[in-house]
Amino acid sequence: MGGCPVRKRRRNGSKEGNHHSTQPKRNKRNPIFQDSQDTEFSWSDNERSSSRINIPERASGPEGNLNQIVTEPDANFPQFLHEGLSKPVYVINWFMSFGPEIKLNTSQQGRNQAV
């Protein structure tokens, strides 16, 4: 049984006697698969204002308080977070984190006012 001799690889990865040219690996990432952190969104003032929901200035009940928190900047509310709330993903994440606290606080305020 005479087999073909096994050829050892050289350090550069090519086989002896192999006439194929080696191509360098590409380090560029496919733009389709970029991380969302790498992508920066820039919204013009027109787009930002048209994406907001028009809410009456004085809404009654706890829902009005929640809407006020989302749409109006407050001294106790970090500016970077308020700017992020113009994007739906940030709004959802923010309410997932702080929604239960806000609901609890507004229901306690309602009890205090009723007493």
UniProtKB/Swiss-Prot annotation:
Q: Where is the composition biased (Basic residues)?
A: 1-12
- Biased composition of type Polar residues is found at 33-44
Q: Extract the ranges annotated as region (Disordered).
A: 1-70
The family database entries (InterPro entries) matched by this protein are listed as: VCF1/2-like
Q: State the family it belongs to.
A: Belongs to the VCF family.
What is this protein's record name? Answer: Protein VCF2
Organism of provenance: Homo sapiens
